[in-house]
Regions:
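C-terminal capping alpha-helices of c-type cytochrome domains
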Residues: 116-163
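Bacterial signal peptide processing site
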Residues: 19-22
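Residues within well-ordered alpha-helical secondary structure of globular protein domains
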Residues: 12, 69, 94, 126, ...
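Sec-dependent bacterial lipoprotein signal peptides
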Residues: 1-17
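Gly/Gly-Pro-rich "capping" loops immediately C-terminal to redox-active cysteine motifs
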Residues: 60-64, 78-116, 138
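The canonical Cys-X-X-Cys-His
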Residues: 63, 67-76, 150-154
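Envelope-exposed proteins and targeting segments
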Residues: 69, 84, 132-134
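Electrostatic cytochrome c docking/interface patches
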Residues: 32-66
Length: 163
């Protein structure tokens, strides 16, 4: 008798049974937020048009492409995880180093500014030059148009609300 097919069937049955097990209940007060539906392209374009100049004429596709340089350390979705860097949802209008569940550098904690597009522009140009002692290892984005596009993408993707 051949054991190969029997072992394969037993393994498959075990995997299927494991997938069907109920998950432990989420502790009260820590229910994950339901993910908001991603805006349509038309909604993104409307949000873009409502941004202050020069961001209202930015190239969102290029901004999203430039964010690929950031996404190994940052997320943008509401309720998204902190990674090596903090989640960026709601970053505009927020005091620097103010997320309670992320350990910022002493330099950024002492900075005391509010994140606005102009601060972010200087920050992503050369983070270590703009604020020596911060923990961000990104070398920077030299092209001003790329920075404008990236900032516009972040404004559209992170819940920007004009101040």
């Amino acid at each position: 008798m051949r054991l190969g097919p029997i072992l394969a069937a037993a393994t498959l049955a075990t995997l299927l049974a494991a997938c069907n097990r109920s998950q432990p209940a989420t502790p009260t007060g820590s229910e994950p937020k339901a993910a908001a539906a991603a805006p349509s392209d038309a909604e993104k374009q409307a949000m873009l048009a409502s941004l202050p100049a020069p961001y209202n004429t930015a190239d969102l596709a290029n901004g999203e492409a430039k964010f690929a340089l950031c996404q190994s350390c940052h997320t943008v979705a509401e309720g998204g995880a902190n990674m090596t860097g903090p989640n960026l949802h709601g970053v505009f209008g927020r005091k620097a180093a103010s997320l309670p569940n992320f350990k910022y550098s002493d330099a950024l904690t002492a900075a005391g500014w509010i994140w606005e597009p102009q601060h972010l522009d200087h920050w992503i140009e050369k983070p270590q030059t703009f604020l020596p002692g911060n923990k961000m290892t990104f070398a920077g984005l030299n092209d001003p148009k790329d920075r404008t596009d990236l900032i516009a993408y972040l404004m559209v993707s992170t819940g920007y609300k004009p101040q």
